[in-house]
Amino acid sequence: MTVRTPGTPASKIDKTPATTPNGHRGREEKIVVTVRLRPLNKRELSAKDHAAWECIDDHTIIYRPVPQERAAQPASSFTFDKVFGPDSITEAVYEEGVKNVALSSLMGINATIFAYGQTSSGKTYTMRGITEKAVNDIYAHIMSTPEREFRIRISGLEIYNENVRDLLNSESGRSLKLLDDPEKGTVVEKLVEETASNDQHLRHLISICEAQRQVGETALNDTSSRSHQIIRLTIESTLRESSDCVRSYVASLNFVDLAGSERASQTNADGARLREGCHINLSLMTLTTVIRKLSVGKRSGHIPYRDSKLTRILQHSLGGNARTAIICTLSPASSHVEQSRNTLYFATRAKEVTNNAQVNMVVSDKQLVKHLQKEVARLEAELRTPDPANEKDWKIQQMEMEIEELKRQRDLAQSQVDELRRKLQEEQGPKPSESVSPVVKKCLSFSGTLSPNLEEKAPVRSERTRNTMGRQSMRQSLAAPFTLMHEIRKLEHLQEQLGDEANRALEVLQKEVACHRLGNQDAAETIAKLQAEIREMRSIRPLPKEVEVGSVVAVNKSVSANLKEEIARLHSQGSTIADLEEQLENVQKSLDKLVMSLPSNNDQQSNNDTTQKAKHPSKKKKLLPLTSSNSINRQNFLKSPCSPLSTARQVLDCEVENRAPDSDDLSCEIQPDETPTKSDGGDVSSKEGTPYRRSSSVNMRKMQKMFQEAAEENVRNIRSYVTELKERVAKLQYQKQLLVCQVLELEANEAAGYNLEDDENIHQIPEESPVSWQITFKEQRQQIIDLWDVCYVSIIHRSQFYLLFKGDPADEIYLEVELRRLTWLQQHLAELGNATPARVGNEPTVSLSSSIRALKREREFLAKRLTTRLTAEERDYLYIKWEVPLEGKQRRMQFINKLWTNPHDAKHVHESAEIVAKLVGFCEGGNMSREMFELNFVLPSDRRPWFAGWNQISDLLHI
């Protein structure tokens, strides 16, 4: 009789593990079952035993009895996921049978690999090879995944005579307790867990576990395993620090080498070996019972996991949260046919067991806190700066709703007007007094009609009163649409006037900016004049030898006197420049006030005005924003365009004019005593009064939105121009100080002395040739580089200066200024030593320790930029080039600390500057210019303006 069982579908084996965050959902898949048939061993060959089992293909194994036994035992076949014959190697068993299951532990899915079979069938031999191959693949995957950080922990235990023993700690005792954990399941108390540092360390720990296992000799096997061995690898992987992901994968990989089932009649066991065999068979019988009940598919019945410590420890691997692979090993000998057949029956049932594998993710407390802090910061930023698109959409929806409401009310009013007109035309006749009564009856909102008796008893005066009130209500209903149209035209006129006033306000600001612009031209002309005189002084030709010494001295004194006069003028203009800066600040504040005064809360203002009107109906507005009486005041505000006070007044006036117009002047046409009472005509008057109030609010919002867009554009243009003026003022201040330094140098040279009696000392300053300038440039730049290193100057500043000034003759002035600044800084640091100077106001203190700390923070900043500005390949290339170990820790800081460390190596300096420039990005887009860079090279002194350019690098580090 041939028995064929279906194999597990390949789609359920080869499918990549699905990512299921937090482990809430998994996917069902069946246990992968493979069968390995070993060749006949020496004992079986010596006993002239023959092979009774044969693998006919990769999925089927068949029983072939000897001819004399075919009648009693017919041939039978079994089909599994994979079948390996006697010639197969362990590597093939691993690659084609259990590799996918083993490597799924790297993705956060628990995995278990069993070796099941009778004694002497090759279980331990197979599991050793499987474990070795799995370790190789695990570490190969770790090396190919540098973006994740892996940590592997190993523990080993054996179950010997139903006692749990720790294989990594022989002193732990013979029996460890099993505890139930609500999250981890069944755990072994006091089980040692070692962390593997590398693959060699892991193999060493596995070999220790194998050496500590109980092994004995039987009639079937010289080295028979007398206990169940479980080696568990706990693999945890986390993304590196550069990622924002806070979840980690945690999974366990179990290598289970079961002891073989045996018959006492075949093993000839007695005493201790017999007792060991009994415990082995009992635990394997419990495992078979669990597999049989799980294969039925009905989970409602009791599954005896707790009947054996083996099934209790491996409960998750049997129908739980894990992927499981079972390797059943067989002996082909005909003397073991019954044991082999029982093994195949066990494998057939195991094929039908379904597991529910899930991805196990955990979040560490430290990573969770960092993630939550970032999330809180992001949410706070969103609250501080709401999405303009959403706010704009909300406003559009509000306006659309108001427009629809106004349209509905307009249609209602129009229908009422048409109805009134039609009734009036129908009732027109020879007696006008008779035509009033029907209209009044239609217009007045009575809850019912008067009875005939009450009509007869009503006096004539009440009849006349009702007729009069009816005519008034009719006139108000007719006048409401025309009033609405009149108010719309009035609002359009107000919109035009408000636009004109806004244009006038912006013209005033532009005139004020132009006034400041003309004010600093005198200082610029004076500085240009001084520069021309200095160039003229340097270009004086050599005087003839017969020129008298007195004339030369007179010329030098006259030049010095002229320069001193110009310096005095510049100092006198210092207050002018300060006033100019103050005026520019006032203009900036005026612009900010103008932006803040733009209408943004119109709805609230309109509601406040309406509420105030309702509380005080008889109170009139004394100051209307756009009436002719205020035109004279507005002209007075525009008289002084250059005064900051006038600018502030103009901004305040614009703020008053941008308010919503009071609705008291709109409602004055309808007298309070003419309005019908609520009982008579209140419904009609309330319906007629709502549309034009809402229409005025909508038109005012439209008008203010148009004005706001135009005003914001003009304010942005003026603000950019004011910023440019501030930069020019700072540049003029710097040039003035530079000229002062040059004059002081000339006086020092004159005092230090020219020996005017010797003709050789009266000579012209020779014009430097390109060759001599290049030599001077290299010497000065090398001095600057040395001083940079001594004074712990910012390496970003070094790189920017080094790459910007490359030997052009126009660079002479910048090198001179930098050399002076560094010389002063060196002297200043030498005088201070390790002391820290006292802080004066808000000015930064410069000391040796503060410079070192600033340089350290700057290097940390550049190390962080490595991951964002460079690719992984570029970083590895630089690590190799700068001799930074690729496997070392803190590679980025090691690399950054090597930059700008050798000032005497020109190649090192150039490469360091290029790397820093690439990390900071100031060379991108050509944004380096001498005009802006000169503000960073000002000499320090006790005056505040000298520190104008010292904060550039610190500002960059706080981006």
From Swiss-Prot:
Residues 630-640 have a biased composition (Polar residues). ATP binds at G117, Q118, T119, S120, S121, G122, K123, T124. GO terms for cellular component: microtubule; nucleus; phragmoplast. Residues 685-756 are annotated as: Required for the binding to NPK1. Induction: During the M phase of the cell cycle (at protein level). Residues 362-429, 557-598 form a coiled coil. GO terms for biological process: cell plate assembly; microtubule-based movement. Keywords: ATP-binding, Cell cycle, Cell division, Coiled coil, Cytoplasm, Cytoskeleton, Microtubule, Motor protein, Nucleotide-binding, Nucleus, Phosphoprotein. It is found in: Cytoplasm; Nucleus; Cytoplasm, Cytoskeleton, Phragmoplast. CDD domains: KISc_CENP_E. The modification Phosphothreonine is found at T145, T675, T690. Residues 418-429, 454-466 have a biased composition (Basic and acidic residues). SUPFAM superfamilies: P-loop containing nucleoside triphosphate hydrolases. Residues 1-28, 417-438, 451-473, 598-640, 658-700 are annotated as: Disordered. Residues 613-623 have a biased composition (Basic residues). Phosphorylated at Thr-145, Thr-675 and Thr-690 by CDKAs and CDKBs. The phosphorylation occurs before metaphase and inhibits the interaction with NPK1 preventing the transition to cytokinesis. Residues 30-353 form the Kinesin motor domain. GO terms for molecular function: ATP binding; microtubule binding; microtubule motor activity. It comes from the Eukaryota. Residues 600-611 have a biased composition (Low complexity). Interacts (via C-terminus) with NPK1 (via C-terminus). Probable plus end-directed motor protein that functions in the NACK-PQR (NPK1-NQK1/MEK1-NRK1) MAP kinase signaling pathway, which is essential for somatic cell cytokinesis, especially for the cell-plate formation and its expansion. Regulates the activity and the localization of NPK1 by association through the non-catalytic region of the kinase. Expression of a truncated protein lacking the motor domain causes inhibition of phragmoplast expansion and multinucleate cells. Belongs to the TRAFAC class myosin-kinesin ATPase superfamily. Kinesin family. KIN-7 subfamily. This is Kinesin-like protein NACK1. It comes from Nicotiana tabacum (Common tobacco).
